[in-house]
Amino acid sequence: MNVHEYQAKELLRSYGVPVPNGIAAFTVEEAVDAAEQLSGPIKVVKAQIHAGGRGKAGGVKLAKSQEEVKEFATELLGKTLVTHQTGPEGKVIQRLLVEEGCAIDKEYYLGIVLDRVTGRVVIMGSSEGGMDIEEVAEATPEKIIKEVVDPAVGLQAFQARKLAFAMGVPVKLVNKFVGMVTKLYTFFVDKDCSIAEINPLVTTKDGDVLALDAKLNFDSNALYRHADVVALRDETEEDPREVEASKNDLNYIALDGNIGCLVNGAGLAMATMDIIKHFSGDPANFLDVGGGATKEKVTEAFKLILSDENVKGIFVNIFGGIMKCDVIAEGIVAATKEVGLELPLVVRLEGTNVDAGKQILKDSGLAITAATSMADGAEKIAALVK
């Protein structure tokens, strides 16, 4: 789960991470009022969307007067901002962050992530902070410095100092930098984050260290432990189908293809998408119905798949372990009848009560194509949608 920058900064502020003073605004009038409450000659008006690259796309403006704040707020609110992370459709700006400007001396990058290779938390830093960090990582990866944290002891002060010196943080500001990194790490662990990124982290001419931007991503599986984070969720920034899926306890991610997939188990779902691609098909979604699917849940899954107008066929791939194939078959039949399915439907069943499940599909009288294996099913659905 993602949150907006202004929400991320308030969360970090509560842990003692220094951030600029700022106020969220949902209207032009609120933006002007916010600017009046803030200090300093420069105000920064920042578009709030769940995507990076806002600066390059024109979503961050420096205002030197109240008139410019009003002008920029009017320009940004309601605008569709297209960045390298939004895709060509972009995202509509519905809120702004108005913030006090600061005299930047140097920009850095600081990020904390879970590393799949080491299975540990890794803290990354670079002296090349700012808008082009992705290009830096690709062109000169040696400029990204990493510190792996031992989970048994947590982040050690010497690791943060080592990072500071490698990044070229001024000696007089190293202690402040170490304090920020330590607090950010504590937040990361306490709140079950998967990403905590500050880009840029800046040193100022006044001798401060500030988180000028903040990106936080939280592990959705741990949200039940963090009601304060859940309260910050902005569903308007998410795919409506993914929001609907979460309400029905379905794991759904929309893709760009035309073959809808209904599978039980995340690993099998990924393998299903791979084998569809192998047979020159294009999956329209990742959809894991989990191990406890009911007829009602399968029906909701079908509705979800069919809400994508690009879908030209559906491949159901079930391996019944905890889940029983006859229950899934009943759900498929009920769902097909309820939604009036007219698209090609290929079903592959294996596992518990598989014979009973296949008989239910056969006796339904519906135009369901049976598959003997995952490869057979993928090949059949790829051919049917062409």
UniProtKB/Swiss-Prot annotation:
Its cofactor is Mg(2+). It catalyses: succinate + ATP + CoA = succinyl-CoA + ADP + phosphate; GTP + succinate + CoA = succinyl-CoA + GDP + phosphate. The keyword Metal-binding applies. Keywords: ATP-binding, Ligase, Magnesium, Metal-binding, Nucleotide-binding, Tricarboxylic acid cycle. ATP binds at K46, G53, R54, G55, E99, C102, E107. PROSITE patterns: ATP_GRASP (PS50975). Residues 9-244 form the ATP-grasp domain. Belongs to the succinate/malate CoA ligase beta subunit family. This is Succinate--CoA ligase [ADP-forming] subunit beta. It comes from Exiguobacterium sibiricum (strain DSM 17290 / CCUG 55495 / CIP 109462 / JCM 13490 / 255-15).
